[in-house]
Regions:
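Conserved catalytic core of the tyrosine transesterase superfamily
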Residues: 1-338
Length: 338
């Protein structure tokens, strides 16, 4: 019989390098999330249970240890029930793979699988009304270089209904604007590809942005160091204009606005414009229409009166175009990107 420690190491390595990466074709973000949770659990065993690293095996994933870990996650780390459930799902995924490799781990997996998910009430996601969107966008100084980039970035978040990961991974090669119906090609969750069509106003400002920034290759949005913009970087940008827009639009004071709020707002606006749910599902890249149905919960009469029609948030005026010229050094750096 293979030693437990060696067996564990081998199964753990193959789970990530072969099963998740090659067989299930996980995206980088999802892969990293799974890796983080398993690492967190192993660190918990080492630091809280005082189990030596060399002695940690699949048998360390027993039901009591997992229950203690989940309690630690909720009570000490203050994670939500939703996060707690997600961590349990990831642990179960690993154990399911382990028992498929070696059936002696079936009992370990079944006992872990018997742990119930915690019920929790779904929090309603805040969305922006048409007026709030306009107020938000007006706080952006598009006459500045950074401001214009932020304007294009946020407009694209909303108009294309993008997830943050989809936005920051968007490359020039994902833009297909010469087509009769311009579109962008998105690689979403689970490496699922989808096409999002854009109206002419959006295409116009993106082309203007590309021209002024001299972008020919690589990622569409870069940070100050000319590196790929990060999720944290997008959050900082949104927070900056959220603080400014609250002063101009008091109704935003009671809302929590995140990068995802723009994707959610677009979905709500489409729904209120009587767009069929299957079309919204396809637009957002949801694998199940049940996920899309979450948006139905917030379409009450009050919201119906506040949203007239899904429309563009871009001011198609010449003044909305950048007035500064591109930086030659920036263009040179972008051209050298691999």
């Amino acid at each position: 019989m293979i030693k437990r420690s060696n067996d564990f190491s081998s199964i753990l390595e193959n789970y990530f390098t072969k099963h998740l990466s090659l067989e299930r074709k996980f995206s980088t973000n999802t892969y990293n999330t799974y890796l983080m949770v398993i690492r967190q659990y192993i660190n918990y065993l080492s630091e809280q249970k005082h189990e030596k690293s060399k002695s940690i095996s699949i048998y360390s994933f027993n039901k009591q240890n997992i229950l203690d870990f989940l309690e630690y996650v909720e009570k000490i780390l203050k994670c939500s029930p939703k996060t707690r459930n997600h961590k349990l799902t990831i642990i179960n995924s690993f154990l399911e793979y382990a028992q498929s490799v070696n059936p002696i781990y079936l009992d370990i997996y079944l006992k872990s699988k018997s742990i119930k998910l915690k019920k929790f009430k779904l929090e309603k996601m805040d969305f922006l009304t048409k007026e709030e969107l306009e107020a938000f966008m007006k706080t952006i100084n598009i006459k500045s270089k950074n401001g214009y980039q932020h304007y294009v970035l946020i407009a694209l978040l909303y108009e294309a209904g993008l997830r943050v990961s989809e936005l920051i991974n968007l490359k020039v090669t994902n833009l297909f604007f010469l087509s009769e119906s311009p579109y962008i090609k998105i690689l979403g969750k689970g490496n699922k590809e989808r096409i999002v069509y854009l109206n002419n106003d959006v295409v116009s400002i993106i082309n203007d942005y590309i021209d002024k920034f001299g972008i020919t290759l690589g990622y569409l949005f870069l940070n100050h160091s000319n590196r790929q913009l990060t999720r944290f970087g997008v959050v900082k940008i949104i927070n900056k204009y959220y603080e400014l827009s609250k002063k101009e639009c008091p109704t935003l004071m009671n809302k929590t606005i995140t990068p995802h709020s723009f994707r959610h707002s677009k979905a709500v606006h489409l729904l209120m414009n009587n767009t069929a749910l299957p079309i919204i599902q396809r637009f957002l890249g949801h694998s199940s229409i049940k996920t899309t149905e979450i948006y139905l919960d917030i379409t009450n009469d009050e919201v119906s009166r506040s949203i007239l029609k899904a429309s563009s948030i871009i001011d198609n005026d010449e003044n909305s175009k950048a007035t500064w010229e591109g930086d030659d050094k920036l263009i040179e750096l972008l051209e050298n990107l691999k």
